[in-house]
Amino acid sequence: MPPFDVPEGDPFGPHNLPYGVFSIPGSSDGPNQPDGPDRTGRADRTGRADRTVGVRLGDHVLDVGAAAHALGSPYASLLARPTLNPLLAAGRTAWSDVRRALTAWVTVPSHREVLEPFFHPLSSVTLHLPFEVADYVDFYASENHARNVGQIFRPDAADSLTPNWKHLPIGYHGRSGTVVVSGTDVVRPSGQRKAPADAAPVFGPSVRLDIEAEVGFVVGVPSEPGSPVALGDFREHVFGLCLLNDWSARDVQAWEYVPLGPFLGKSFATSVSAWITPLDALEEARVAPPERTHELLPYLDDTDADQDGPGGYDLRISVALNGHVVSEPPFSTMYWTAAQQLAHMTVNGASLRTGDLYGSGTVSGSAERERGSLLELTWNGRDPLELPDGKRTFLEDGDVVTLSAWAPGPDGVRVGLGEVTGRVVGRGV
């Protein structure tokens, strides 16, 4: 099908236009890219210069740098790059201007002849990590998930939530160097683990490897050290979102996490989707977050009617294990919003950097079929999942996990959020 002939209702139509980075196998000079100063920058962590920014339309990707040069766009120098970081840093005005231009390019018939050479079938390209990750922070924002975890590990506690949970978004710093793009194999991690009945810890591969279905938020504009980012400034700093799988070794995590929290049980791999959906594509998906049950401190209080619209997002996530859907977590149930997480992350004066990534935390709904981790779905291994290819409590070598999602868009159409997939491999494979 020609690139412009996107079927009506396609979740990757002109209403969406997510950004990614791609290369064409066998091409070392970049797809349709000019030489010269506009090809500066680094691609991911590899320094590869054969990668370039693309925008998805249907089942094609548009080389937006080449298109911008051909059409004389003033933003060509931001787009003809091997990573999204220059565009991320350019700020909200540039983001809006580029999006308006892209929408016109792919919808106005007079542009077709110029742009058609710069479209490539998705089946013919390789997708890469779309931005250079600066810092990575992960949160714990789902009340359903937090209560489930509390009931599993603290069954005798008077309250399954910790005393601070309703007062602040709990989070921790992860490892940006182990953020990988969808399709990257995940090697089963090793570490210390100790079962309750064991006299001493042992070392070896994790036997309780899990996933966490999350949404990641990508920071564009940095902030000054010592200057907190207010709730109302969220959209001035955050460019868009992606799907995120926070792989977790539950046995390693359980032994190590007291008193400082997650470390080796989390730091070995975090997978993200290859497409970054700009916030401007998700206006129709904005919803009010769940009702607050505790009064919030002013820097987290989002009840002000003057705020820039509701802070929640109605994102419908699907979790598939070896091709079988096992859960459909609803992001609209998240207690803490991305804006509140950003405000809390910077309230002490910690600065933002272009390319910062922060995860929402595991997304879990109130129903059993809406839980976003195997820990919850199997209730810590007590209730195995019955799948066509056998039972599962935690992940086995060779298992493939795929998260996909969509959001409500204009006129009833869906906004596709792509997918993030990863295959578990044993060490030495």
What kind of region is each of these model predictions?
Residues 1-25, 49, 56, 62, ...:
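Active-site microenvironments in enzyme catalytic cores
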